[in-house]
C-alpha cells in the first residue's frame, strides 16, 4: 500500500513537472558554469547506453536521446528501478545533487545557450567546420553577445571578414565591367546601323529579282 501511494504521488508530481517545464533541456541550458571553477564533477552512467555524464548533462541526454525508454530503467543515482519518467524522478528525488553539483547562475537563452552547446561538442574550439566555409552575417541584435564572449567572436570574426572581403572584391570587379559595357555601346550601335543598311540593300536586290522574274513570266505567256 505504501509503495502504491508513493508511486501515485510520484506520477502526479511527474505530470505537474511536465506541465510546468515543457522543455526540460532548455531549462537545464538556462544555467552557466561560473568560470574559474574546475573542481571535480561527479558523473553518472546512463542506464540506457552506459555513457557517463554529469547530473545536468545526464538529464538532458536522457530527455533528448532516450525519451521512449525513460519510463522504465534503473536510476543511476539510487539504483532503484523506476516505473515513471527517469528525468522527473532524478530532479524530484535527487534535487540535492543539483545544488551540490556546482554553483550556477541563471542566464537567458539565445547565443549563450548555443555557445555552451558548441563548447561541449567542440572542446578544441574548431567551430569553422559547422559553416562549411560559407559566409556568415552577424545581426546587430547579437553584436553585444558576440562582443561579450571572446570565444564566440573568435570564430565569427574570420567568417564575417571573409564575407566583406569577398563583397569588396565583387564590387571592385564590377566597376571595370560597367565602364567596358558603356564604352562598347557606340560600337554596337554602329554595327547595328551597318547591318540595317546591308539588309536594306539585300531586300532591294530581292525585290528587283522578283519583279524581273514576274515580268519575264508574263512576257512568255503573252508570246
From Swiss-Prot:
Disulphide-bridged cysteine pairs: none
Positions where Phosphothreonine occurs in the chain: 114
Post-translational modification: Phosphorylated in vitro by CPK3 or CPK11.
Induction trigger: By drought stress, but not by abscisic acid.
Keywords: Nucleus, Phosphoprotein
GO molecular function: DNA binding
Annotated localization: Nucleus
Pfam families per the UniProt record, alphabetical: Di19_C, zf-Di19
Gene Ontology CC entries for this record: nucleus
GO process terms (BP): positive regulation of DNA-templated transcription; response to abscisic acid; response to salt stress; response to water deprivation
Chain positions with Phosphoserine modification: 116
Tissue: Expressed in seedlings, roots, leaves, stems, flowers and siliques.
PANTHER family (UniProt xref): PROTEIN DEHYDRATION-INDUCED 19 (PTHR31875), PROTEIN DEHYDRATION-INDUCED 19-RELATED (PTHR31875:SF26)
UniProt similarity note: Belongs to the Di19 family.
Stated name of the protein: Protein DEHYDRATION-INDUCED 19 homolog 3
Organism: Arabidopsis thaliana (Mouse-ear cress)
Phylogenetic classification of the source organism: Eukaryota, Viridiplantae, Streptophyta, Embryophyta, Tracheophyta
